[in-house]
Amino acid sequence: MNVPVGCTLEEVFQQTGLTMEYGPVSAKVNNKVEGMHYRIYKQKTIEFLDLQSASGIRAYTRTLFFVLCKAAHDIWPKCRVMIDIPISNGYYVDIERKDEQGNKIEMTPDDIAELRERMTTTIAENHPIHRFEATTEEAIEMFRKAGSMSKVKLLENSGRLFTTYYDLDGYKDYYYGNLLTTTGKLHLFGLEYYYNGILLRIPSRENPAKLGAFIRQDKMFEIFQEHHQWQEILKMRTVGDLNAAIEHGYANNLIQISEALQEKKIAQIADEIAHLKGVRMVLIAGPSSSGKTTTCKRLSVQLAVNGIRPIGISLDDYFLDRDQTPRDEDGDFDFEHLHALNIPLLNEQMNALFRGEEVELPRYNFQKGKSEWSGKKLKLNGNEILVVEGIHALNPELTAQIPDEQIYRIYASALTTILLDSHNYIPTTDNRLLRRIIRDHKYRGVSAKETIRRWPSVRKGENRWIFPFQENADAMFNSAMLFELAVIKKQAEPLLEEVYENCEEHAEAYRLLKFLHYIKPISEDQIPPTSLLREFLGGSSFEY
C-alpha cells in the first residue's frame, strides 16, 4: 500500500483498516522491531505486533516502567527508582527515599496505594508519550542534571552520536527499546507490596486481558538479594559500573572475586549435603544453558573434599523406547515430556541401590530409539552418593517412590542481577540465549539463526517442565557472573551479525547486538579453566 512520506507506523496502521484486539504496540520493519512512533520514508516491509508477541509485551512493560517512574517522582521528587529483577510473574521495584537525616524511609502499603492511584490517573488521562532524538552529549548532560547517574554512565560508553529519549508530561527518560505512543494504551497493571518494595504486575502474554498469575518465589528472591548485597559491596549494580571497572583495569579482580563467590557457594552446598545424614541422591535441574553440567562437576569435586564419592547417573539413559514416547500437539516426539522417561524403572533401581543391592544400568541407543542394558553393574558403598542432572530433576513425580530424606535437590540458573541502568533491567533469558548461541555454534555446528528460531520452543518446555518446580529446591545456585556479558560479547557478536536482515530471526539478533554494544569487552584469556563459563566458551579443564 502507498502511504504519505514521513507518516508514523500508527498512522500506517490506521490507514490499513485492520483491527488487533491487543495492539498494535510495535512492528517489525524490515525485520527490526520499531515503536509506533517510527516514521516511514521509503519502501518497507511491515508486520504489526500485539501483546501476545515477545516484542509487544516488552514495549508494554517498558511503558509501565515509564509511568511508574513518572508517578513516583511526582509524589516523591527526590526519590530514586530502581527497576530490578523479574520475579513472581512481575518485576521487583525499589523506591529509595530518605528523611532529612539521610535515613531510608521504608515503603508502606499506603505509599503503594498512593502510587497506584497516581499511575491509574496518568493512564486514564491518556497522555501522549513523545519520542525525541538528541546528541548523546546533550542527553548525558540532561540526565546528569536530573541526577540519573546510571544513565550517564551507560550513555558515556554507548559510542553513539545520537540518543533517543522519551518525554511524558515533562518527565524525560531513556529506555532500551520502544514505548507505546500514549499512556491510555496501558489497559491493565497491578502494584503490590512485596518484600519491603513493590511488585509491578503485567498482563499475561497468553491472555492479555488478565494479569499474569502470581507465583511465590521466596527462595529465588533470596538468591537475588544475596547477589545484590555483594553488588553493593563491589559497587557493581549497572553496566555503567561494569564498564568503569573494565576501563580502570579492575576486570581481573572482578573475575577472581566472582569465581571465588561461585566456588564458595558450591562448597557450602556440598558441606550441607555432607552434614545431612541419609542423603543418597543429589538432583540438579535448571533451564537451558544454565550451566547445570559444570555445576554438577564442580559440586562433585567439593563432595569429594568432604569424603564423599559422587557417582553420576544420566537421566537420558532412562528414556522409553521411541514407540512409547509421548507426542506433542504437532504430532512430533516430545522428548522433553516427563513421561518420555521410564520413571518406574528409575525409582525401582534407585531404591534397590539405596538398599545396598547391585543393579545393571540401562543405556539408551539414540540411533535405534531403544533402551538397552549397558552391562555396567553398580552397587553403592557407604561413602558414595548419586548425582543426577536433568530438566525433570525437581519434579516430584520423577522420584515419587523414593523417600524425600534421601534426596537433596539443587536448582541452577543464570539469574542476571546486573542492570543496564536503574530503569532498564537485563532479562535472564538473554544471558542464557547468548550462552546457547555460542555453545550451539562451537559444539554442534548450529547457526545463531537456528538457535534463535528454536528458542521459543525451548522456553515453552522450560515453562512447562522446569520453572513450576524450582521452589522445590533445597538449594539454589546462580551461575551468572557480574562480568559475564563482557566476556561472551566477543564470541556472540560475530555470530549474531550472520543473522541477516532478510530472515525473521534478524529482529532478535539485532536486539541482542544493540544491547551488547553498551558493554565493554573483557578478554576470555583471563577466565580460569574451571570456570562455569568455559562450558560455553571452550577451554574447560572438565570433560563434557
Q: Where is each model-derived feature located?
A:
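Conserved lysine of the Walker
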Residues: K292
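Hydrophobic positions on the alpha1 helix immediately C-terminal to the Walker A/P-loop
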Residues: T295, L299
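Hydrophobic anchor at the beta1->P-loop junction of P-loop NTPases
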Residues: V282-I284
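Conserved nucleotide-sensing/catalytic segment adjacent to the nucleotide-binding pocket
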Residues: I311-I313, L320, Q324-Q367
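Post-Walker A helix-loop "phosphate-sensing" segment adjacent to the P-loop in P-loop NTPases
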Residues: V301-I311
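Conserved NTP phosphate-binding and transfer environment spanning the P-loop NTPase/kinase superfamily
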Residues: K277, T399-Y544
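Auxiliary tRNA-acceptor-end handling modules of aminoacyl-tRNA synthetases
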Residues: G23, Y38-Y41, T45-I57, R80-I87, ...
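Glycine-rich phosphate-binding loop used to anchor ATP phosphates in small-molecule kinases
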Residues: N347-E405, W455-F469
